[in-house]
């Protein structure tokens, strides 16, 4: 590997702008200088070719004047000893290289074909002659002549040897050259020594006679051709100038004849090696040949195609399959595309000389100076010469630019500037063209390294493109033989492998006597005269291409020898030279004359034998040139491979060093990292220990603090516990003292209460005596009046009984239709009917007795229904009579209601169990002020004894009594007309019946209740404790009133009845008079399996005591007017058997209580004669439809008042009641019932205070639809009310007539007693 490769690599890296494959820096070669004393020489060339005495070609160099001054500046001469030593060393190197070649490689080198020899001769002629038509014909003649001579020689050899073939023929010619060389060596050993001979040769070469002779010949040539010359000798001048411009060592002046002989001897020796080597190759195994061949292809593939083994193997397989590819690859491997360089050289060299117009030596000197690229680059660099490295870099850049600028599609060079074209021409014409050629080859191979088969075929196109771009003369393009650059497939159509090894068997005996040592010595001798610089080979380490810069002189010397031989053969006489050089730009009409003169001279001067000998020598020169190129190429390839392997090895070593260095760096980094990690771990461990110590100290401090706090907390708790114990002790003592004081206070209060109770009992007894006397008088008067009315009604019933039997069916249907078509008229008629029935029934009781009660009652119902039905349809006069009767009954009821409208206390409820009042008492109450008259109508608590709530309690009682204005409003509502108010809620049929029953009992001289006080007196304890429970009773009473509803059927619950709010729980479940005294709700059958507890009739005392008191009162023996318990059964009654009537007309007790507990055998049952559903319907049917109007009136007032901004949705109850009374008179209980019902049906909110009293109404969410009076009529009706079965036994057909009216009676009965009042 050259010493400058590493430095070149480093410099190319530092610059960065140069590619890897740039030409390495080459040291300037040592040049020899030859001093020429003949300055007057006018010969335009740098050499003289002539024949020696023995017929050998002699070449004499004549350095030009213009170049002598430059060369004098070069370094000193090389000594002859050094040249000889280098030649010997090169010979030894080539000998060892030849021995190292494989048999196949030797065979390929020695295999020479006829066409190859002729091709070399033709190419030489084309390269060194002009392209005119005359020369073209001359070339054709020469080619034909050379081929004829070759064939003649081959025929002569074939006559000697019948088995002659082209290869054997060529080897024989080389053998002749070897024999002549050996003979010449023997002659030289017998003559003078080498030094004296060499001096003589140099002296003869530099003699003035030879130079004068050549000068005269040149002057004669110029004088004869001055007027005719149109073209110069571009080939000769170009070659001469190029050689002179090359900055290489000049060829030493030596004996040219001896040098020629040496070259011939070398070629002969090289030609002999092939058969000897081949003999050894034949004996080897064929498998080894295949392997060696594959190895060579593998190396080539890895170098030029791809370094990957898989791709290389595939390429080798393709070569085996395609012979054409294999042939092309072999050509590329052997020639390395030197044709490309030669073509470019031949293209540019003539073009550079076309500017020459004169043939003076001064012009040639000026031309050479102008074409010098160094001076041109110095001029471009502002007079500063470029360094050698910069000069080489510029050449590499221009070479790559030219190759890369070639476009293979349009066959043109693109993107080249004029300066680049000028530099390219100057580099091609310089004496360093081999260096530039190598750069071009390198750039060319680099571009086509992926497609190596396109390399040779593209060379002609690139050359044409360069010629077109630089405007070359068209004649110069004719010199480019494209056939020379055709694909290797056409050049190797005849496969060289057709020759078998048997071809060389004939030569074995012929060359057996040749010793290997002789061959080596023969090979060494011809190269002994060459300098080491001429044979040194440099390689581009990056691309693997051969650099021929240093061995250019050897190639030039061999080429000169060849040229001289050819010229001597062609121009033995001056006339021939004159004829050849007599060319110009325009041959004109003398072309034919020149041709004739050439032919005449040729025939006259040389005979056939001499011409044949010259042809043999020319063939020897061609074969020598071919072998020389092959051997040198093989040597260069091997050196390139070795250098490449060395480079790869160095690269691998460098890579290994880099890797080792990187590994060391990585290990060092890892060690540092590990060290830092250990340090970090140590720091973390130290920090952790420190934190652990701090944490333990902190925990210890916290533990001590907790202990201290715990001790302090225990002390505080102990002190607190002692204080608490002391405080509890004091509180216990204080509580005991207070209990003792409380006991003493209660004892005093109990004594005081007992005294007050005794006083009240005494006053009460006195008051009751007075009331009994008044009631007795009133009852007597009423009884007489009822007996009179009853007698009249009985008479009418008897007359109507027969007519009703006949018209039973039609009358029943008529009654039902009229009732549902006009409910108001029907209600009036029914009301009148029941009013009359009340008097008739009472009269019947007074006259008839219990036997005819049932008949009278049934006939009364049927007759009265028929009468009112007929009156409504036919007789207006009778309707007037009935209206008078109805008005009388209503007056009586209004009088009774007005008399009993006052408020009373809870103590007065016991008075309701006594016999009823008389008319005188009622008159007295009606005529007096009910609020202020406390002397006759008030008890000791200031409450009226006459007004009783229909719910069994006082509405306006208690210490928190309502104002006088509100009481007056209530009394005013109670005195209103029954036709416009809900009278049934305050006066009911049972009340009237109880009134009549009580009058009947009094009329039969029954003992009053106040006369039986000794037997069952009122408990003094109950009278004493009434004040304590007065507030609770009022709150419970208010809650009961707010939940009443008149339109819903009563739903009694045994649990509600048992949990009484007004009496003791111990007495709530007792039956005062026996087990049969049970309560049954109106909505259930009369006879049930269960026996609910008795509903209390008193809110103050024990229910058992009051019931016992009442039973004693009922158990008094009666006269014949008394009615037995079997006269009217319980199942025919609309009420329950043990229902407590809350009406103000009743005594507050049950009316169906048997007397079994009293053992009297007689029960008080006459009240049932007046409590039938017909009587109830008569009083309530008129007010059923009016409830709807009252509710609608309330709703309208609520809406009106709620829209007022000052009310904001809230309406006080007293304001609402006053607003209602302005439009229609209504009593306050009925008003409350309607408000409560609207609260349920229309989602109104009732505002109550803490005691449950209703204070106002607040409008709620969207109202629900209002339920009608007949919505749940049939479902809630008592089974005993669904039909008058009790009437069917006495009067046939009455049940069907009464069916429609019984429903209305049921609804009226349900509206009389609200369910909520009973539940509470």
Curated annotation (Swiss-Prot):
Swiss-Prot/TrEMBL GO biological process terms: microtubule cytoskeleton organization; negative regulation of translation; response to salt stress
Basic residues biased stretches: 1-22
Coiled coil regions in record: 637-807
Annotated family: Belongs to the NST1 family.
Function in brief: May act as a negative regulator of salt tolerance.
Keyword line: Coiled coil, Cytoplasm, Stress response
Record region (Disordered): 1-85, 541-598, 656-766, 1048-1073
Name of the protein in question: Stress response protein NST1
Subcellular localization, as worded in the UniProt entry: Cytoplasm
Pfam families listed in its UniProt record: NST1 (PF13945)
Primary location group: cytoplasm
């Amino acid at each position: 590997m050259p010493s400058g490769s590493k430095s070149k690599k480093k410099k190319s890296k530092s610059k960065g702008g140069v590619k890897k494959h740039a030409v390495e820096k080459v040291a300037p070669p040592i040049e020899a200088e030859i001093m020429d004393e003949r300055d007057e020489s006018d010969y335009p060339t740098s050499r003289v070719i002539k024949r020696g005495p023995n017929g050998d070609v002699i070449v004499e160099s004549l350095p030009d004047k213009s170049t002598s001054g430059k060369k004098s500046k070069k370094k000193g001469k090389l000594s002859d000893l050094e040249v000889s030593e280098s030649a010997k060393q090169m010979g030894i190197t080539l000998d060892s290289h030849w021995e190292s070649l494989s048999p196949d490689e030797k065979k390929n080198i020695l295999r020479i074909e006829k066409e190859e020899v002729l091709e070399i001769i033709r190419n030489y002629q084309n390269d060194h002659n002009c392209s005119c038509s005359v020369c073209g014909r001359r070339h054709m003649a020469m080619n034909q002549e050379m081929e004829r001579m070759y064939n003649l020689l081959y025929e002569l050899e074939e006559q000697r040897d019948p088995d002659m073939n082209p290869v054997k023929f060529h080897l024989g010619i080389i053998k002749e050259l070897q024999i002549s060389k050996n003979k010449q060596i023997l002659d030289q050993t017998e003559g003078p020594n080498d030094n004296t001979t060499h001096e003589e040769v140099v002296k003869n070469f530099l003699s003035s006679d030879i130079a004068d002779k050549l000068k005269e010949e040149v002057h004669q040539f110029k004088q004869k051709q001055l007027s005719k010359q149109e073209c110069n000798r571009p080939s000769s001048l170009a070659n001469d100038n190029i050689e002179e411009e090359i900055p290489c060592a000049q060829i030493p002046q030596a004996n040219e004849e001896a040098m020629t002989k040496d070259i011939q001897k070398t070629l002969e020796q090289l030609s002999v090696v092939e058969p000897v080597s081949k003999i050894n190759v034949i004996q080897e195994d064929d498998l080894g040949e295949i392997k060696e061949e594959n190895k060579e292809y593998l190396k080539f593939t890895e170098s030029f195609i791809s370094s990957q083994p898989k791709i290389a193997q595939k390429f080798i397989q393709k070569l085996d399959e395609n012979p054409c590819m294999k042939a092309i690859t072999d050509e590329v491997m052997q020639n390395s595309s030197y044709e490309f360089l030669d073509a470019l050289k031949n293209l540019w060299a003539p073009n550079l000389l076309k500017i020459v117009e004169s043939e003076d030596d001064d012009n040639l000197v000026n031309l050479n100076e102008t074409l010098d690229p160094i001076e041109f680059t110095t001029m471009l660099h502002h007079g500063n010469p470029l360094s050698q490295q910069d000069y080489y870099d510029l050449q590499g850049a221009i070479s790559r630019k030219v190759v890369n600028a070639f476009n293979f599609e349009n066959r043109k060079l693109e993107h080249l500037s004029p300066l680049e074209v000028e530099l390219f021409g100057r580099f091609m014409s310089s004496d360093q063209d081999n260096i530039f050629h190598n750069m071009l080859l390198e750039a060319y191979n680099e571009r086509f390294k992926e497609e190596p088969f396109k390399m040779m075929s593209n060379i002609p196109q690139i050359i044409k493109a360069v010629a077109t771009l630089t405007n070359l003369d068209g004649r110069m393009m004719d010199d480019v033989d494209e056939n020379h650059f055709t694909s290797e497939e056409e050049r190797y159509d005849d496969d060289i492998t057709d020759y078998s090894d048997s071809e060389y068997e004939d030569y074995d005996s012929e060359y057996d006597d040749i010793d290997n040592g002789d061959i080596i010595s023969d090979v060494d001798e011809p190269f002994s005269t060459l300098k080491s610089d001429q044979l040194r080979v440099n390689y581009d380490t990056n691309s693997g291409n051969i650099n021929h810069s240093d061995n250019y002189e050897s190639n030039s010397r061999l080429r000169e020898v060849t040229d001289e031989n050819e010229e001597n053969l062609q121009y033995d006489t001056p006339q021939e030279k004159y004829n050849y050089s007599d060319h110009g730009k325009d041959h004109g009409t003398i072309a034919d004359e020149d041709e004739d003169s050439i032919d005449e001279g040729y025939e006259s001067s040389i005979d056939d034998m001499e011409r044949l000998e010259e042809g043999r020598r020319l063939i020897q020169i061609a074969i020598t040139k071919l072998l020389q190129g092959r051997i040198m190429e093989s040597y260069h390839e091997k050196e390139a491979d070795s250098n490449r392997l060395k480079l790869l090895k160095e690269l691998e070593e460098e890579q290994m060093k880099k890797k080792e260095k990187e590994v060391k760096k990585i290990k060092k980094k890892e060690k540092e990292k590990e060290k830092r990690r250990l340090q970090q771990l140590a720091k973390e461990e130290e920090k952790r220990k420190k934190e652990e110590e701090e944490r333990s100290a902190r925990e210890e401090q916290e533990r001590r603090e907790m202990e201290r706090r715990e001790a302090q907390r225990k002390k505080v708790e102990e002190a607190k516990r002692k204080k608490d114990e002391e405080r509890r002790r004091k509180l216990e003592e204080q509580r005991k003292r207070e209990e003792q004081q409380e006991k003493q206070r209660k004892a005093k209060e109990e004594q005081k209460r007992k005294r007050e109770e005794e006083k009240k009992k005494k006053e009460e007894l006195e008051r009751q005596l007075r009331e009994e006397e008044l009631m007795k008088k009133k009852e007597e008067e009423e009884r007489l009046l009822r007996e009179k009315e009853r007698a009249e009604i009985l008479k009418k019933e008897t007359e109507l009984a027969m007519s009703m039997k006949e018209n039973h069916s039609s009358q029943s249907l008529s009654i039902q239709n009229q009732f549902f078509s006009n409910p108001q008229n029907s209600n009036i008629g029914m009301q009148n009917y029941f009013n009359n029935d009340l008097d008739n029934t009472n009269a019947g009781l007074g006259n008839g007795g219990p036997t005819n009660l049932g008949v009278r009652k049934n006939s009364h119902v049927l007759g009265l229904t028929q009468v009112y039905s007929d009156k409504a349809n036919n007789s207006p006069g009778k309707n007037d009579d009935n209206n008078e009767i109805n008005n009388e009954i209503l007056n009586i009821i209004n009088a009774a209601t007005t008399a009993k409208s006052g408020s009373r206390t809870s103590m007065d409820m016991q008075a309701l169990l006594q016999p009823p009042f008389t008319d005188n008492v009622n008159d007295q109450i009606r005529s007096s002020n009910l609020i202020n008259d406390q002397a006759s109508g008030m008890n000791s608590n200031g409450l009226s004894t006459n007004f009783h709530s229909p719910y069994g309690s006082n509405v306006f009682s208690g210490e928190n009594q309502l104002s006088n204005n509100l009481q007056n409003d209530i009394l005013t509502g109670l005195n209103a007309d029954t036709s416009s108010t809900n009278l049934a809620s305050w006066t009911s049929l049972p009340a009237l019946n109880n009134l009549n029953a009580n009058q009947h009992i009094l009329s039969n001289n029954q003992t009053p209740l106040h006369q039986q006080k000794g037997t069952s007196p009122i408990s003094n304890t109950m009278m004493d404790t009434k004040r304590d429970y007065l507030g609770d009773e009022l709150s419970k009473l208010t809650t009961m009133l707010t939940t009443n509803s008149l339109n819903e059927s009563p739903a009694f619950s045994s649990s509600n009845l048992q949990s009484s709010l007004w009496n003791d729980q111990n007495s709530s479940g007792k039956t005062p008079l026996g087990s049969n005294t049970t309560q049954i709700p109106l909505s259930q059958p009369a006879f049930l399996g269960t026996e609910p507890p008795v509903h209390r009739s008193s809110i103050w005392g024990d229910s058992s005591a009051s019931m016992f008191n009442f039973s004693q009162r009922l158990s008094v023996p009666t006269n014949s007017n008394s009615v037995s318990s079997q006269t009217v059964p319980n199942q025919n009654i609309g009420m329950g058997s043990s229902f407590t009537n809350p009406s103000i007309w009743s005594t507050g007790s049950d009316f169906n209580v048997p007397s079994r507990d009293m053992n009297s055998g007689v029960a008080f049952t006459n009240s049932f004669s007046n409590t039938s559903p017909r009587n109830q319907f008569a009083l309530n049917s008129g007010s059923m439809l009016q409830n709807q109007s009252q509710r609608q009136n309330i709703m309208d007032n609520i809406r009106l008042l709620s829209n007022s901004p000052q009310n904001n949705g809230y309406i006080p109850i007293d304001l609402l009641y006053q607003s209602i009374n302005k439009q229609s008179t209504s009593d306050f209980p009925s008003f409350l019932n309607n408000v409560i019902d609207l609260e349920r049906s229309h989602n109104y909110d009732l505002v109550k205070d803490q005691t449950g009293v209703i204070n106002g109404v607040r409008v709620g969410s969207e109202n629900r639809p209002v339920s009608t009076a007949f919505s749940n009529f049939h479902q809630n009706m008592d089974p005993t009310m669904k039909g008058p079965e009790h009437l069917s036994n006495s009067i046939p057909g009455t049940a069907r007539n009464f069916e429609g009216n019984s429903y209305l009676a049921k609804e009226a009965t349900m509206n009389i007693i609200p369910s909520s009042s009973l539940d509470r």
